Amino acid sequence: MTTTFERQGDIAVGSEAKPRRAPAAALAAGAVLCASALAMHLRGGVEDVEFVRRVEATPDAWLTGHVFMGVGGILLLLGLVALPRLVQGRGRRVVAVGVTLAAVGAASSALGDVAHGTLAYMLVGEVPAEQSLHIQERLYSQPLLVAVSMPAMLLPLGMIVLGAGLLYSRAVPRPLALLVLVAPIAVQLGYMVISLPMPLMVLPLVAAMGWLALLVARGTQTGR
């Protein structure tokens, strides 16, 4: 069946995208899990013994947060791949590039976080904090693990490109596109400025992905 479009400027009213409830649910759930993990994560220097001791003081919370991030990253990946269907024509390639970068970053982040969180958890109570730090530093300097974990930096970059593509495409409301742009910047600020409350800094991520999930679930394109 052929779907027709009415054009208002460059905005497509209606869409060929079909409702996709599974990717929508994955996108929303992934954002909630990642946001929860970020809010739980200990902030500060990760290359000192004092940080290791902080992990040892709350090992269960540490592991839970990293498992949340791992599962959330995979769910985000599954949800992100449905987003290009929301965009027709204008901005579609930019959105596709952003989704690709973010998906690769999400997969890398998921693997790296689970490995990092599990190792630190397993060492709690088994070796002194100084030795635990030494073991972790040696392991994470291995070329294979570096190759697996480094692409995680593509996740925030991909989100920024995705937001720019959505803004240019006019396929979604402008406030939503701006939320997608702001979300990774807010999270990075939360990491850099310890005085900022991380639960507040992850709200743009949850709001943006939740809003996108609604559009994916409906299979519609709304314009600005």
Labelled PLM ranges:
Residues 2-224:
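Hydrophobic, aromatic-enriched alpha-helical segments typical of multi-pass transmembrane helices
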